[in-house]
Amino acid sequence: MLCLLEVFIIMSTSERVVQSILYELGCILIGCLVMHFVPHEGQPFVLMVIFSLLAMVWNFVFNWIFDKLVPGDRLARGPIIRTVHAVLFEGLFMIATVPIIMYMMQMSFWMAFMTDITMTLVILGYTYVYNWVYDRARLYFVEA
């Protein structure tokens, strides 16, 4: 029988894929809902699918580079390192996403920038809740 700590640490590759897919489906839905309140041209669903795919690739690349630059025990990373990680991840991602929003939704830079910030803040809250719920649900299903 696995101890509680092992249940939280050990995740198979297939479970990580399922976790990522479920997360990104939620992001697509939330992004489309946010876009409902923003004046735009274009297809928000297509934009959100593109962002979802970009985010998955960016997550892999960014975390690989970050882990090389900040080696050591990932569990020992404190709030400062985690904050730097999050700000760099989102800030660099926005460098790519703002021009895409401008082009696909036919928005000005300012409108695309504000839309991206809004989506980022909403997704930030979703990320917190999603991972909290997922970890608890996972514990229930893994122990079952």
Region locations from a protein language model:
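Juxtamembrane/disordered regions of integral membrane proteins
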Residues: 4-144
